[in-house]
A protein has these predicted regions:
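Long, folded non-catalytic interaction modules
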Residues: 1-130
Length: 130
């Protein structure tokens, strides 16, 4: 966590909000979400955690879903901090348009919704079995 804190504290962004979407399906995921919330808060950020409902995530990396095509500056810091903590990450841009398109095509599609004030979300899935 020291390496993560170093990255987070060095960031000079004015907007230090981060949204953690936690899959409640496994105790390990819930524990990781709580630990990340603590590290972000100690690093001077404003984390908000939400439990994912309506779907079960497959095991995989920590995913950063960016609403627009261009990443806000905070995304790079968040990604570097997660990687400094030994986590594998994937980043996807243009998620808001993708979500809306999928919902239009299939109203029953279970995706991860983004609120208007969320430029990005960090999705914490169960870790793959090694």
């Amino acid at each position: 966590t020291d390496a993560m804190l170093e990255v987070l504290r060095a960031d000079t962004s004015t907007d230090k909000r981060v949204w953690l979407i936690v899959s409640p399906g496994s105790p390990e995921t819930v524990t990781l979400g709580a630990a990340l919330e603590t590290v972000f808060r100690e690093g001077g950020w404003q984390p908000t955690s939400q439990k994912l409902t309506g779907m079960v995530l497959k095991p995989g990396p920590v995913r950063i879903l960016v609403g627009e095509e261009l990443e806000p500056p905070a995304v790079d810091t968040v990604r570097r901090a997660l990687e400094a903590g030994g986590l594998t990450t994937e980043t996807g841009t243009g998620y808001r348009a993708f979500y809306e398109e999928r919902k239009r095509d299939n109203p029953n599609w279970a995706g991860i919704p983004m609120e208007a004030e969320q430029p990005f979300v960090v999705v914490i899935s169960p870790r793959p079995v090694a």
